[in-house]
Amino acid sequence: MAACRCCDTSPGITLFPYFAILILILAILVVGTPNQQYHHSPSTYEYKTQHISIAK
């Protein structure tokens, strides 16, 4: 809990690494998702249409 005392003195500096990690993960997801969506969109679209037709 000693880290909390450091956070009180300079919250911006201590939180910066967490924001950097979040931005990195978001960047990887944004770069990676278009390829996955492009490859998987036909199958997921067919699955959704079949699911909707079964529900009706």
Swiss-Prot record:
Keywords: Membrane, Transmembrane, Transmembrane helix
Membrane topology classification: Single-pass membrane protein
Superkingdom of the source species: Viruses
GO CC annotations on file: membrane
Subcellular location: Membrane
Transmembrane segments: 12-32
Hydrophobic: region residues: 19-31
Protein name per its UniProtKB record: Uncharacterized protein p6
Species assigned in the record: Tobacco necrosis virus (strain A)
